[in-house]
Structure formats: C-alpha cells, structure tokens
C-alpha cells in the first residue's frame, strides 16, 4: 500500500471522530460506564464519583447553599461523564473499524476433501471445520477458514480484511502460502489445510482486538495508574486533615469546598484520558494497516533501540534484476548465459525470471526443461539449480557454489573472487553459476536503494535507534549498500539463525529489538524480538509468532510502527505533564476561597482576582471538567511526532505542555469567572 493510501486511511479515521453515529454511541456508553465495577478501574474517576455522591448528600441534607451545592454536584457528575466519554469514543471508533471486518465474516459452506491431493468431497458449514482438515476452493469462491495452501496457486482478493484492492498471489510451498477466512479466490484452484479453530481465526482475533475486548493495560499504563492512585490517596489524606488544621486557626471549612479542592488536586485530566490514549494507540496502528495483538506491542515499538531490517523490500525496492553476465577466463559468454537460463527456468523468484529474460534478450533460444530435477533455493544451501540430461547446474551465493564445487574435488580459480568483489563493490549482488565441477562465471543482479531511506535512518539515529541491515549478500555487496543507505551495521550472508542470535545478543545488552519476517524460518526470531512485525502475505507460523501483522505486507512499515509507538508514549507523557501542570492554577483559585475570610493575608493568593469564593470554586471545577473533552481529539490523534533526540523531545514537551499547562488554566479560569459574573452577577 502506498503512503498516500495510508494517509487517506488516517484522514478518514480523523473524520470519523466527529461522525454523529460515533458521538451518539459514545454518549450512551458514557452513562453505561457509570457502573461501580467500571469506575473502580480508574482510581481518579472513582474518587470524583464518590465526591459527586457526597456533594449530593450534603446538599440534599441542607448543610450547604442549595444552588451552589447542586451546581458543584452537577459539575462533578459531568466530569465523570466526560472521562467516560473519552474512553467510549475511542472504543466506538474501534467498533466502527470492526464492523467493516465483521462484514467479511460470512456463513460459508466449505468443500472438505480427504487429502491434499483431493479425493472424496463433502460440503460442510465452515463452522464445522477443524485444524488439519483439507479444503478445496475454486475461482469465485470464498476461503472458509484460515489455513496454509498445500496444493495449487491462486490470486486472492483480500480487500475485505486488508483494505487493499489489488489481488495477491498465494502459492503452496512458498512464504506466501497463508490464506485468511473471508477472502475470495479470483482465479485458479487451491487446496489448503485448516490451521484455526472456529472463532479463533485471524479475522476473529482482529475483530476482538479492534473492539478492545481483549485490550489489557500496558506495563507503563499500569505504572501510571498506580502513580495516579498513590497521588489520589495522598491528596485524600491531605484534604481530610485540613478541617483539623483549620480548627486551630478558628476556620470552619465548607465540606463542598473540601470536595472541590480534592477534585482539583487529583490529576483528573489524565485520569479521564488515560484509557482513551491506550485504545487510540492500537487504533492508530490499525490506521496504518498494522494489526497489533496488544497495546503492549505498540508501546514497546516506541521504546525500541535496535531495528533489524531486511535489505530487500525495506532498504531497497526488492526488485533485483539480472543486468550482466561475467564469464571467467576460458568460458564463453554464451555458455554462461545458457547455463544460467537453464538453471532459472523453474525459478519463481523475480531474480530467476530476470535471468531468463536477460538471456533471451541476448539471443538465447527458448528451451523446455522437461524431465529435469529442479533444485529449489533454501536458506541453508543458498543456491538452486537443475539436474537434467546428465548436467548439474547450480547458481547461488559465491561461498555456497565454491563449497559445492570443492565438495566434488575441484579447485576454484582465484579469478572468481576478483569477479565477485568487482560486482559487489558496485553495490550489486553477484550470483555465481557452476556446471558440474566447473565455475562458469557471475551473474550481476542490481537493486536500487529506496529514495529518502538514508534521511529516514538519520532521523532514527537522532532518536538513539540503531539500524542493522540483514542480507544474504556477500560482505562486500552488503557493505556497499549499507554505506549508500546509511545503516549503522549489517549482517551479510545471513541465515535465519543469525537473526535470532543477533536479537538475543542485543537483548542481553539490555536493548529492545524490532524485526520483520514472513517465513516459517523467521518464526523463532519474530517470537524472540520485542516487536515482531509479521507480513500478512507470510506463513501462518510467522503471523502467530509476531506480535504485530502488517496487512499490506510492506517490510518498510516497521519504520511507521516505531513512529506510532513513539507517538503513543509522547502523547501519554505530554498529557500527563499538562494534567499535573494545570493543577497549579486551581490551587490559586480554591485555597483563597477556603481561607481568605478567616486569614486575610491569604487573599494575596487570589492572583486571578476572582470575583468571589464560590465563583472561584465553580470556575476551577468547570475548567477541570471542560478540559477533558477539549483534549479528546489530541488523545485520539496523538501529539505530533517529530523525529529528534529524547532530550529535545522532553524540552519541547515541557515548554508546550508543562509551561502551557500552567499558563492556560489561569486565563481560562479567569474567563469562566467573568462569564459567571455576567450570568449570575457578583
């Protein structure tokens, strides 16, 4: 999916914030969340609700001025509602996204077959399918369950799940063999093996996660909740002790003023917005077409220190094309060309197809390799080829081909290493071709580093994030591309176990690691990584192992995931700073109202020159309530993220949300006081 597509999705999500249906649903849910069981999950809001009930009891019993008492009670009640509304609107947006996914889940009839080869066919409801069952799906039919293709190849429309209208190719025996229930086969026929129980499919998990049914608080969120609870308890003790202290100076305190002071002291702003921030983080990831299996995954993405990035598709465009044949001395160029083409006829990779194309462009005659035994490429052998008519042709990484030839008792000309280095220094990938015991030469495969990727890595470096390029290329090619792209380190001639070893080494050093993978051989590393981004086009094992799935199957999306995680952490930190900072102005509003009558010197604290003690209390409480809905858009969209160092981010946020959090309430409370005077009189 292009950046434009993702941007459009974000814009549609922002517009949905003000959708009438979402607002109405959130308002209803806000009242439903007044249940004690829900309120107790937020210590701050639970105390505000307790203060609301107590204020109502005091007013109803005649122990306070009725008009003032009911006004305080109403404002406190609205404060709780606004906190509930913030969480409800975040959940409502998630349910809206889930509704589109639910439409993809249909009551389907499956064609269950006996074996991977077919056999007797039985039509059964999709709900009766179990892991291990074989199902046949033909052109125009819907895939009834999650599974792995065991026979055939087909183009599949996954728009109902991923939002991407372009069909994708799925094929047995490749890293693109996974199919998702609810998608539609557009061409050909496949047999797949069911891998998920009914109700536990990929689509079911997406719906549950998006709706928030399985959302658990992240470690940082739990820590912040405990901090808010401790602060609330501390302020509760302080306020409870004030009547005794006031008695020594002959002051009788109005209980309503004490309740107002407590509510203004405790961090109600962040207390009301905290659940919404957590839910919004997962929603923002989904807006980028990334399914996070937990809020923790999004949060950890913002804390990663090391990114392991596959070269192909992430750093380069991933479209390596054969551009030249370089025969060794004594080898005819035509001999190398024809051998490379013959070894590539059954190679389904873009590189293999490009070799055939280049050979034909240079005059090679189209041939068929019927009866040949094709040798597939594996991550362990790192070569492929064909055995046909007494000939054994191999193409692959230089060291692999050298080992193959030497295993047959042959020696390799020193010229080969020079050819390999010559191609590699130019940033291309050398692919060595051998026939039998003889090395014929090198095929040059060229790729292009993505535009703007070097600047992106520079931004990551400024944030203290180390980038490591993973590639199967030889060290010289890897070094050339790493220098061009601006990565900090690279692993050349990498195997799947090398990724796992590097992740463990980084984690042993106390660093958090993120990586991308799509194959079954990537599963151990994806599971080990702190952030494992699996490609939706990959195998079921990879998607199960990772804690995130990119529905667009774009390896470069890992960079966007890091930005979403950073934005999540920055948003929570910024709003916490603002919440604590804006309490300062409330002190200057409430404290003079409590003590100025008995202690005239306390009037000096009335720096805002508020009209009366009761107006001061009402103004502070009204601001305290209104600031929650005012900040909901910021909580849901997130604070704007600008790549920079942690020190620069802290300095910027302290100026905007710290200093701003102190100054804004002074002006707002004074404006509310003037409005109260205009409406109610002095």
UniProtKB/Swiss-Prot annotation:
Membrane topology of this protein? Multi-pass membrane protein
Q: Any idea which positions bind ATP? A: 347, 351, 377-384, 395
Q: Keyword set for this entry?
A: ATP-binding, Cell inner membrane, Cell membrane, Ion transport, Magnesium, Membrane, Metal-binding, Nucleotide-binding, Phosphoprotein, Potassium, Potassium transport, Translocase, Transmembrane, Transmembrane helix, Transport
Q: Membrane-spanning regions, if any? A: 15-35, 42-62, 66-86, 233-253, 257-277, 588-608, 616-636, 662-682
Pfam families found in the cross-reference section: E1-E2_ATPase (PF00122), Hydrolase (PF00702)
Q: Which organism is it from?
A: Xanthomonas axonopodis pv. citri (strain 306)
UniProt catalytic activity: K(+)(out) + ATP + H2O = K(+)(in) + ADP + phosphate + H(+)
Judging by the UniProt lineage, the source's domain of life is: Bacteria
Principal localization? membrane
Query: Under the cellular component aspect of Gene Ontology, which terms does the record hold?
Result: plasma membrane
User: What SUPFAM superfamilies does this protein map onto?
Assistant: Calcium ATPase, transduction domain A, Calcium ATPase, transmembrane domain M, HAD-like
Keyword DNA damage (UniProt): no
Q: What does this protein do?
A: Part of the high-affinity ATP-driven potassium transport (or Kdp) system, which catalyzes the hydrolysis of ATP coupled with the electrogenic transport of potassium into the cytoplasm. This subunit is responsible for energy coupling to the transport system and for the release of the potassium ions to the cytoplasm.
| Annotated compartments | Cell inner membrane
Active site per database record: 310
Which PROSITE patterns does its entry note?
Answer: ATPASE_E1_E2 (PS00154)
Q: State what protein this is by name.
A: Potassium-transporting ATPase ATP-binding subunit
Q: Which family does it belong to?
A: Belongs to the cation transport ATPase (P-type) (TC 3.A.3) family. Type IA subfamily.
- Specify which residues bind Mg(2+) according to the UniProt entry for this protein: 518, 522
Q: What class of enzyme is it?
A: translocase
């Amino acid at each position: 999916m292009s950046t434009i597509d993702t941007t459009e999705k974000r814009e549609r999500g922002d517009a949905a914030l003000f959708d009438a249906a979402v607002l109405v649903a959130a308002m209803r849910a806000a009242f439903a969340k007044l249940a004690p069981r829900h309120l107790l999950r937020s210590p701050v809001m639970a105390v505000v609700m307790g203060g609301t009930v107590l204020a109502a009891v005091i007013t109803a019993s005649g122990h306070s001025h009725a008009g003032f008492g009911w006004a305080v009670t109403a404002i406190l009640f609205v404060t709780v509602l606004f906190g509930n509304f913030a969480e409800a609107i975040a959940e409502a947006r998630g349910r809206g996204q889930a509704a589109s996914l639910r439409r993809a889940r249909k009551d389907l009839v499956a064609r269950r077959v006996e074996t991977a080869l077919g056999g007797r066919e039985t039509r059964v409801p999709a709900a009766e399918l179990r892991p291990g069952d074989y199902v046949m799906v033909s052109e125009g039919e819907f895939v009834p369950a999650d599974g792995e293709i065991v026979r055939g190849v087909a183009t599949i429309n996954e728009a109902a799940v991923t939002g991407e209208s372009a069909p994708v190719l799925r094929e047995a025996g490749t890293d693109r063999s996974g199919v998702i229930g609810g998608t539609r086969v557009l061409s050909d026929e496949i047999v797949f093996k069911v891998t998920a129980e009914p109700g536990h499919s990929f689509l079911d998990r997406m719906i549950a996660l998006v709706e928030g049914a399985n959302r658990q608080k992240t470690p940082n969120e739990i820590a912040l909740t405990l901090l808010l609870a401790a602060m609330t308890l501390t302020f509760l003790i302080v306020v409870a002790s004030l009547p005794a202290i006031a008695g020594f100076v002959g002051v009788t305190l109005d209980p309503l003023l004490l309740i107002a002071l407590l509510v203004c002291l405790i961090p109600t702003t962040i207390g009301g917005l905290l659940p919404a921030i957590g839910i919004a983080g997962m929603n923002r990831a989904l807006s980028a077409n990334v399914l996070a299996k937990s809020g923790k995954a999004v949060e950890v993405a913002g804390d990663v220190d090391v990114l392991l990035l596959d070269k192909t598709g992430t750093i380069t465009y991933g479209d390596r094309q054969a551009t030249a044949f370089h025969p060794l001395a004594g080898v005819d160029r035509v001999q190398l060309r024809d051998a490379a083409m013959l070894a590539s006829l059954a190679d389904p990779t873009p590189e293999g197809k490009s070799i055939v194309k280049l050979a034909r462009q240079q005059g090679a005659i189209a041939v068929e390799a019927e009866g040949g035994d094709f040798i597939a490429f594996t991550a362990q052998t790192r070569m492929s080829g064909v055995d046909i008519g007494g000939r054994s042709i191999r193409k692959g990484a230089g060291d692999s081909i050298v080992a193959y030839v030497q295993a047959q008792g042959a020696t390799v000309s020193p010229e080969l290493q020079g050819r390999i280095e010559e191609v590699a220094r130019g940033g291309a990938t050398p692919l060595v071709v051998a026939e039998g015991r003889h090395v014929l030469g090198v095929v040059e495969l060229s790729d292009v580093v993505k535009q703007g990727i070097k600047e992106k890595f520079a931004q990551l470096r400024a944030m203290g994030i180390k980038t490591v390029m993973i590639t199967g290329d030889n060290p010289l090619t890897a070094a050339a591309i790493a220098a061009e792209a601006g990565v900090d380190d690279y692993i050349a001639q990498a195997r799947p176990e090398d990724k796992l070893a590097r992740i463990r080494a980084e984690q042993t050093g106390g660093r958090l690691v993120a990586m991308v993978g799509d194959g079954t051989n990537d599963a151990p590393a994806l599971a080990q990584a702190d952030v494992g981004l699996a490609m939706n086009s990959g195998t079921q094992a990879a998607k199960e192992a990772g804690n995130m799935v990119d529905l667009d199957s774009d390896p470069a999306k890992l960079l966007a995931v890091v930005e979403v995680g950073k934005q999540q952490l920055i948003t929570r930190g910024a709003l916490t700073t603002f919440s604590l900072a804006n309490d300062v102005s409330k002190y200057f509003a409430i404290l003079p109202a409590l003590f100025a009558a008995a202690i005239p010197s306390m009037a000096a604290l009335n720096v805002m020159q508020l009209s009366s003690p009761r107006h001061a209390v009402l103004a502070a409480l009204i601001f305290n309530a209104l600031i929650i809905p005012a900040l909901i858009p910021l909580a849901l969209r997130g604070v704007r993220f600008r790549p920079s160092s942690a020190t620069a981010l802290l300095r910027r946020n302290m100026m905007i949300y710290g200093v701003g959090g102190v100054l804004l309430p002074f002006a707002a409370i004074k404006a509310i006081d003037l409005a109260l005077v205009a409406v109610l009189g002095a």
